Amino acid sequence: MTTQAIHSVLAMMNITAEQAAGNTLTLSAPATAGAGFMSELNSSIKQINGMQIEARRKAEKFELGVPGIALNDVMVDMQKASLALHLGIQVNNKLINAYQEVMNMAV
């Protein structure tokens, strides 16, 4: 599978995921494939980190007794952050496996 084919499959997967989430996304190829992938990867890592930070802040506010912060909201945010982290780890593992498979291909 060529790099262009891989990027095309990844773009289609992103479109499907966005449509499933209810967002509309237009099909466009990134200007440079490497930069597009790196920016998506960095964006995802920052988003996961942001979810974890927000969950911790909400938990701290709940512990301090700030009005308007309910336990169920704290628990839901903590679970969302946990699921996002586990998803990120699984995606990382799949990318490493794909990289190793490509590197082991005979030329």
UniProtKB/Swiss-Prot annotation:
GO terms for biological process: bacterial-type flagellum-dependent cell motility. Signal peptide: none annotated. The keyword Heme does not apply. Pfam families: FliE. GO terms for molecular function: cytoskeletal motor activity; structural molecule activity. GO terms for cellular component: bacterial-type flagellum basal body. The keyword rRNA-binding does not apply. It is found in: Bacterial flagellum basal body. Keywords: Bacterial flagellum. InterPro entries: FliE. Belongs to the FliE family. This is Flagellar hook-basal body complex protein FliE. It comes from Sodalis glossinidius (strain morsitans). The lineage of its organism: Bacteria, Pseudomonadati, Pseudomonadota, Gammaproteobacteria, Enterobacterales.
